[in-house]
Amino acid sequence: MKQTDGRERKAYLSLLYFAVILLPVFLLGCYLYNEKQLRVGQFQEFNTHNLQEHITPLQQSKEDKDKKTDLVPLEFCDVFTGKWVLDNVTHPLYKEDECEFLSEWVACTRNGRPDSKYQKWRWQPQDCSLPRFDSKLLLEKLRGKKLMFIGDSIHYNQWQSMVCMVQSVIPSGKKTLKHTAQMSIFNIEEYNATISFYWAPFLVESNADPPDKRDGKTDPVIIPNSISKHGENWKDADYLIFNTYIWWTRHSTIKVLKQESFNKGDSKEYNEIGIYIVYKQVLSTWTKWLEQNINPSQTSIFFSSMSPTHIRSSDWGFNEGSKCEKETEPILNMSKPINVGTNRRLYEIALNATKSTKVPIHFLNITTMSEYRKDGHTSFYGSINGKLMTPEQKLDPRTFADCYHWCLPGLPDSWNELLSLYIIYKI
């Protein structure tokens, strides 16, 4: 009987221990767990809400586009080898009459050019597909930055193209254009960005630098080792795109000033030296300046290869014209190289110069793709000193047809599409 009472007492004490001590602990644990879950849920909901709140439509669009471009192995693709494809859907990238900043000089349709097919050719690389040009995506990359074209009138041509390619997505009143003696600056207020052009046809100092000496009527005189005067204006840019070619093609020699500066009077003391020697010297001066003044972690450097001319129609087997004035189609047979007179020796000097520097320089090989575009020049539909060509001038294409510069919209837009690929995806 006592044994039974002892067992009952132990059972009673165990139950009492559970009720008094363990049960409250268990209930407290349940309460704390539920409270934690509630707080975690509230925290996760808060974070998700904030995340969605800060994703703008532009950012979502950019994400989607980045996912698509993952399929494009641009880093393995030679985007400069390909063919021209007629594309009425995506090209032209803008309309001539919708770009308020397009000058009469290259507005060929406005100036009476009757055909427009030259605006509708898209460059298709051989080994990859390219994402469609997205002006908003490019402007996002340029936000808070400065992009500068430096060189001759071909680069001014390309700068105008770039301005027209992006300006349509910028609200009215948020974009301005300013011209100075050496520069043209397109300011994009909404993005705190600028796209500018700096006139330096030889990169180094020359007598063709002043505004009243740019018509090509005066033989150029240069100082091959003097670049700092120009370079001071380049230092704070985030993207520098250089070119120098067309002024080198006039003669087999070029005049080199004996003095160190043009400021010491109008000296005629100069030496005439072969263009290849001086071109190499100028590019050496240029690359040394870049190495001493440009931080490659902050500034990206590009060099555009030679923009070809089409001044002999016999080069492409057409003997009824004299230059490019009757051309409305590209050369579509790209299975064999074409010789339209591009100075390949200058090309090789430039290519080698960009390869042998301490700072990386992206060589934009626009030459071959452009050699097939005999149809794209301003020809009779540009302007000379702000004046359209007269009927009498059009009877003399050998003298007056401009087969150097390019109509816009047109070929320079394709150059800028490829430049934009480097800026958006490769850098």
Curated annotation (Swiss-Prot):
UniProt feature coiled coil, ranges: none
Transmembrane regions: 12-32
| InterPro entries according to UniProt | TBL (IPR029962), TBL_C (IPR026057), TBL_N (IPR025846)
State the GO CC annotations.
Answer: membrane
Cell location: Membrane
**Chief localization:** membrane
Alphabetized GO MF terms:
O-acetyltransferase activity
Q: Which UniProt keywords apply?
A: Membrane, Signal-anchor, Transmembrane, Transmembrane helix
Topological relation to the membrane, as annotated = Single-pass type II membrane protein
Motif DCXHWCLPGXXDXWN motif per UniProt: ranges? 402-416
Q: Where is this motif: GDS motif?
A: 151-153
What's this protein's function?
May act as a bridging protein that binds pectin and other cell wall polysaccharides. Probably involved in maintaining esterification of pectins. May be involved in the specific O-acetylation of cell wall polymers.
Which family, according to the similarity comment?
Belongs to the PC-esterase family. TBL subfamily.
**Extra facts:** Contains 2 motifs that are conserved in esterases, but it is unlikely that this protein belongs to the catalytically active pectin esterases.
Q: What is this protein called?
A: Protein trichome birefringence-like 30
* Organism encoding this protein: Arabidopsis thaliana (Mouse-ear cress)
